[in-house]
Design a protein with these regions (language model features):
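A Lys-centered signature of the CheY-like receiver
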Residues: 130
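Non-catalytic signal-transmission and effector/linker regions of two-component phosphorelay proteins
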Residues: 1-19, 25-45, 51-54, 58, ...
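Short, glycine/charged-rich "phosphate-handling" switch motifs in NTP-dependent
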Residues: 125
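Receiver (REC) domain active-site loop signature in two-component systems and cognate sites
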Residues: 79-81
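Residue-level signal for the "D+5" position in two-component response regulator receiver
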Residues: 46, 83-84
């Protein structure tokens, strides 16, 4: 099951496709409300376990329709989930050259330092412990915006990875 969220009166930018991988309904609701409250018009898709995340990203099973389920530009990933853990999903994504460029943000209730180190070691772009208030979550999203638009150096070439980077650089 997926939810897609958009806002017509949001600030003008090119929306990106974000995949939230989360099994806790309350955390899903908090994220949806934070996007709504912040008038973030990116497309947010939600899957509820690790295997479903890999199916979504690779376009397998019910996610074969790429118009309806596009490859995500950013993944928000919980660690503790059914079927496959967030670590297993992260390792699988980073081991596959088709998906290793997708930034993965660990958004999890674990504040364990070992999990932080393990996440970065497996290729996470960021680690955000929950609970995150709406305001704090919006600051995080704003921080990504600053990173992609101001700090990140983009390649001069025009290949698929540059186009993806250019798309990412324009979000929020």
């Amino acid at each position: 099951m997926t939810e897609s969220l958009g806002s017509e009166d949001a600030i003008s930018y090119k929306p990106i496709d974000i995949l939230l991988v989360e099994d806790d309904e309350m955390d899903i609701e908090v994220t949806l409300r934070a996007f709504e409250k912040g008038r973030i018009r990116n497309n947010l898709f939600v899957v509820r376990d690790g295997q479903e995340a890999l199916d979504f990203v690779s376009g397998q099973g019910q996610y074969q329709n790429k118009e309806k389920y596009p490859r995500p530009d950013l993944i928000l990933l919980d660690i503790r989930m059914p079927k496959l853990s967030g670590f297993e999903v992260l390792k699988s994504l980073k081991a596959d050259p088709r998906f290793d460029f997708i930034p993965v943000v660990m958004l999890t209730s674990s504040k364990n330092e070992e999990d932080v180190v393990k996440s970065y070691g497996a290729g996470a772009a960021s680690y955000i412990p929950k609970p995150v208030s709406y305001q704090d979550f919006l600051k995080v999203v704003d921080g990504f915006n600053f990173y992609w638009q101001i700090i990140n150096k983009l390649p001069n070439g025009k290949d698929k990875s540059s186009e993806r980077a250019l798309k990412l650089s324009s979000w929020i």
